[in-house]
Regions:
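C-terminal extensions
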Residues: 1-135
């Protein structure tokens, strides 16, 4: 699923306008431009948006490549210590699902946490996808 930049968690209208002015309208375009450090730095220079924020959004866009991961769930994954597809593929479903439950109980980021079988499907898909983010 493709998301408009305004739909990326934490972007908001002001940042969305800056990203659109820089030619980035979707999550896929943000990931493409910001997968490498040089791209993130160039976008930071062009828009004045903090490199830290750009990296966070790019990491979320990386996670959106997984079926079932959208803006809120990407936020939950990040809060549970999973920033990227590359990180997700190394996780154990039972442990990650438990951590997601614990984090969501405190931060209330999503309406529901996926069951272990759903988390396993996400991990399996992550194993099939190429790594995009570089640091």
């Amino acid at each position: 699923m493709t998301y408009k930049v305004i739909d990326i968690e934490g972007v908001g209208e002001v940042y969305a306008e800056k990203l659109i002015a820089a030619g980035i309208k979707t999550d896929a375009e943000l990931l493409e431009k910001c997968a490498k450090p040089a791209g993130r730095k160039a976008l930071e220079t062009e828009t004045g948006i903090s490199g830290k924020l750009i990296l966070k959004w790019a990491n979320h866009c990386d996670l959106y490549r997984i079926n079932g991961v959208g803006p809120q769930f990407a936020e939950l994954l990040e809060a549970a210590g999973v920033d990227t597809v590359k990180e997700l593929k190394h996780r154990v479903a039972e442990n990650l699902q438990k951590k997601l439950e614990e984090v969501n109980a405190v931060k209330n980021l999503t309406n529901r946490v996926p069951a272990v079988v759903e988390v396993q499907k996400m991990i399996d898909q992550a194993k099939e996808l190429p790594a995009k983010m570089e640091y």
